[in-house]
């Protein structure tokens, strides 16, 4: 068998912005742009970036870097990270401003307070460090006004969860290591965590994680939830639950399609099809335990889709969805352990019709419910 090729890593928006800021500040101090420009990542690695643009005037320098996400399907891949840098007033330090396409935080609960540009703490520190190092080399004060912009960023942001997090006007400048690991989906999981933070800061006591648009629409209608209570967890139920364990919310609903909730019931915390399919022999055993007619057990064992199984069970008068929801509840409750949370599981079909439910119960009761 031919081995799969290694996937190419990329660079975060924070790393790209740091490189552009360093090049711009160097130009203000020396009159020349370093190209390529080398930066040090938080882990100590040095890497160089080629400049896409550069311009220098008496009062400002502008440099830009094209975001390369490697082989990761990142919406910001190919975006232009542009930094315009001016010398700040004496003693002002480094200040940050959102230019075109960079968002502004409007809700509490994130690492950056409302009113500030959506430039996360690690990228801010990376930029401050790069400026401080250059300032020390050239005996300069190190005061700088840093404006970051991403042309087209506001349109790109509609393909992210920024709007739901209360980040308006564009994208966030992100990254904790400076490196994008392909298909780690760290940005999505990061957004889930920040969604929980925003909900908690807003006093929301009931959040709902959904696997997709159909289940989100259905659970929102069922519980009349505000948008800030909705967590687009996708396949990452494990990442959501682990964060909720240490950042609890009184009530949690997990809502999803029958196939993904069946995988949760079978113990999977990553619901992506690449991580594993529905175990149909296991589903047949669950159907038998739930009291499904004997004549459909073998067809279930050899079914092609979970939807087909639920249709078979429904046609023979068995509420298989409730049994699957109950088992999914036990799996999810085990992750939450003894957090002060009541948990609910909802299964929906493709039309948004409820197919199974395990109602709210405190997760500390899970041992009694097994």
Feature locations, PLM:
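Surface-exposed flexible segments
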Residues: 80-82, 222-226, 358-364
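A structural signal for small-residue-enriched, beta-sheet-centric alpha/beta enzyme cores
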Residues: 4, 8, 15, 165-172, ...
């Amino acid at each position: 068998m031919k081995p799969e090729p290694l996937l190419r890593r990329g660079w975060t928006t924070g790393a790209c912005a740091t490189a552009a800021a360093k090049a711009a500040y160097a130009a203000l101090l020396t009159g020349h742009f370093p190209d390529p420009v080398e930066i040090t990542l938080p882990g100590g690695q040095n890497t160089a970036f080629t400049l896409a643009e550069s311009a220098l005037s008496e009062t400002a320098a502008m440099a830009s870097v094209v975001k390369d996400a490697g082989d990761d399907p990142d919406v910001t891949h190919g975006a232009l990270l542009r930094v315009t840098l001016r010398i700040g007033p004496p003693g002002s330090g480094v200040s940050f401003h959102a230019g075109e396409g960079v968002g502004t935080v409007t809700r509490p609960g994130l690492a950056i307070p409302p009113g500030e540009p959506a430039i996360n703490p690690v990228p801010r520190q990376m930029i401050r460090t790069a400026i401080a190092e250059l300032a020390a080399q050239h005996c300069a004060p190190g005061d700088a006004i840093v404006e970051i912009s991403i042309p087209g960023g506001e349109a790109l942001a509609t393909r992210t969860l920024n709007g739901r997090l209360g980040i308006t006007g564009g994208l966030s400048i992100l990254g904790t290591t400076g490196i994008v690991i392909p298909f780690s989906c760290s940005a999505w999981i990061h957004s889930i965590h920040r969604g929980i933070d925003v909900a908690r800061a807003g006093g929301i006591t009931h959040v709902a994680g959904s696997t997709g648009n159909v289940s989100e629409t259905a659970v929102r209608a069922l519980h009349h939830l505000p948008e800030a209570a909705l967590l687009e967890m996708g396949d990452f139920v494990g990442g959501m639950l682990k964060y909720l364990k240490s950042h609890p919310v009184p009530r949690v609903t997990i809502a999803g399609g029958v196939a993904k909730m069946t995988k949760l019931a079978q113990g999977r915390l990553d619901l992506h099809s690449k991580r594993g399919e529905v175990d149909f022999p296991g589903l047949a055993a669950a159907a038998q335990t739930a009291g499904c007619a004997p004549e459909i057990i073998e067809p279930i064992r050899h079914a092609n889709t979970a939807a087909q199984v639920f249709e078979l069970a429904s046609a023979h008068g068995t509420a298989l969805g409730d049994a699957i929801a109950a088992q999914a509840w036990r799996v999810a409750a085990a992750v939450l352990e003894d957090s002060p949370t009541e948990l609910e599981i909802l299964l929906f079909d493709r039309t948004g019709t409820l197919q199974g439910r395990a109602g709210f119960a405190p997760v500390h009761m899970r041992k009694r419910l097994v």
